[in-house]
Amino acid sequence: MSTITVDLATKKYDVKIDNTLHTRLGQEISAVWSARKISLLTDSNVGPLYLKDTAKQLREVGFDILELEVPAGESSKSLSVAGELIAKMAAAGFTRGDGVIALGGGVIGDLGGVVASLYMRGIAFIQIATSLTAQVDSSVGGKTAVNLGNTKNIAGSFYQPDLDLVDVTYLNTLTDRDLVEGYAEVVKTSALANQDFFDFTGQIKSVADIRHHAQELSKRAIAYKASVVMADEKEAGDRQFLNFGHTFGHAIELLAHGELRHGEAVAIGMIAISSRFEQHGIMPRGLTTELLSRLEAVGLPTHSHFIGTTDFFNHLINDKKNHDGILNLVALEKVGQPIIVKKKIADMPAFVEN
């Protein structure tokens, strides 16, 4: 087992990475939490696979479990669903001494974090990440948010967990598409981190390779993200680098109305922004091709007809990274050296179209 400690000014917690954690959840969680009520939150995809066994393990070590299941998908990542969950917890008599465990992927992690942060102004929170996206990215660092209308992640807060459990065995029940979606975030992280990690993703030539190397990929991605979060918890500086590909990606994801997964949209966003930065001499020639080869090797999409449309630019205007008409976009001077490039919203059509 690998343990990566996230040591922040206000909190310290471990991210544990292994392939047998699912067999000792009660042991791991009871080492961090005393006996209490737990709201065990999952979705309709993960629930049938893991909810009953997880609840059983937790009850065996003395926890009182409220099982909560929501429909799978982005539609559950809303204030209305969060409110319904909070109401159920209140009806069950939850107090400030109780906790929330998110058992699932990125949507459940976000939703669970929001619920934990809001209930009685904040109760304890643990992540059990079951998707590659959640394991390597969204479960680490404390970002929690829900969507409002057509704006992603607009309502939320930074709310760190007490523990983050990453068991790559959960990935065995993911479809190839679900797994590959998360791999887009791994490629992103490898480009931001260092040449050694980037070379490693260059060796991944198939979905089978992702599955075979999942634990090492997760460990490297989490180690990099943890280092960034420890240096900049609230995204005032270097944590913005983790948004590489996301400004364009979020717009594309919203315009696709569910036809594209988050990681697929991020893959498209990375190529779209990188190719334009190359054309403007901000990124080195050939780096876009290297990113492209890693993404296409596992079947990720890399182009979208939405880029450059009026609706695309409207979503950029509404992006939460828009500060007074200026977007902070992430580029790479070279692998391992990300930078922020400020672009006026008014200049984006010319930048994108050229």
From Swiss-Prot:
Cofactor remark: Binds 1 divalent metal cation per subunit. Can use either Co(2+) or Zn(2+).
Cofactor(s) needed by this chain: Co(2+); Zn(2+); NAD(+)
GO MF, one example: 3-dehydroquinate synthase activity
Pathways per UniProt: Metabolic intermediate biosynthesis; chorismate biosynthesis; chorismate from D-erythrose 4-phosphate and phosphoenolpyruvate: step 2/7
Catalysed conversion reaction: 7-phospho-2-dehydro-3-deoxy-D-arabino-heptonate = 3-dehydroquinate + phosphate
Binding positions for Zn(2+) per the UniProt entry: 185, 246, 262
Keyword Zinc assigned: yes
Keyword set, alphabetical order: Amino-acid biosynthesis, Aromatic amino acid biosynthesis, Cobalt, Cytoplasm, Lyase, Metal-binding, NAD, Nucleotide-binding, Zinc
Gene3D superfamilies: 3.40.50.1970, Dehydroquinate synthase-like - alpha domain
Top-level division of the source organism's lineage: Bacteria
InterPro entries: Dehydroquinate_synthase (IPR050071), DHQ_synth_AroB (IPR016037), DHQ_synth_fam (IPR030963), DHQS/DOIS_N (IPR030960), DHQS_C (IPR056179)
Job description of the protein: Catalyzes the conversion of 3-deoxy-D-arabino-heptulosonate 7-phosphate (DAHP) to dehydroquinate (DHQ).
NCBIfam families with a match to the protein in the record: aroB (TIGR01357)
UniProt-recorded name of the protein: 3-dehydroquinate synthase
Organism, scientific name: Leuconostoc mesenteroides subsp. mesenteroides (strain ATCC 8293 / DSM 20343 / BCRC 11652 / CCM 1803 / JCM 6124 / NCDO 523 / NBRC 100496 / NCIMB 8023 / NCTC 12954 / NRRL B-1118 / 37Y)
Lineage, uppermost ranks: Bacteria, Bacillati, Bacillota, Bacilli, Lactobacillales
Gene name tied to this protein: aroB
